[in-house]
């Protein structure tokens, strides 16, 4: 592990209102697990996504996994297409793999 916090860095670049929306959604998942598919969806191989609709009608995604019983945010992005880009999935899977090794 590198000690970097790429999701936190990404969030800090967003407008404050978007940060709050995404933060609330992550907290709902973290403290209300399990939650419904509208907010959280499995992506396979231990990877999940938090789905946030921002005020600007943009869609944000935070990809996460569990490590040592804790939810760990692995990658985040603004969704631009209906299907999650393979590159985004690969980044999250690699980070999850690095944590497990």
Where are these regions (language model features)?
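Basic, Lys/Arg-enriched alpha-helical interface segments
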Residues: 1-59, 68-71, 78-101
């Amino acid at each position: 592990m590198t000690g970097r916090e790429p999701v936190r860095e990404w969030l800090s670049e967003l407008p404050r209102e978007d940060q709050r929306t995404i933060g609330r959604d992550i907290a709902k998942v973290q403290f209300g697990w399990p939650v419904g598919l509208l907010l959280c969806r499995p992506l396979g191989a231990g990877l999940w996504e938090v789905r946030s609709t921002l005020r600007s009608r943009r869609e944000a995604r935070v990809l996460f996994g569990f490590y040592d019983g804790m939810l760990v945010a692995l990658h985040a992005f603004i969704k631009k297409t209906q299907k999650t880009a393979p590159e985004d999935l690969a980044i999250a899977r690699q980070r999850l793999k690095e944590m497990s090794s």
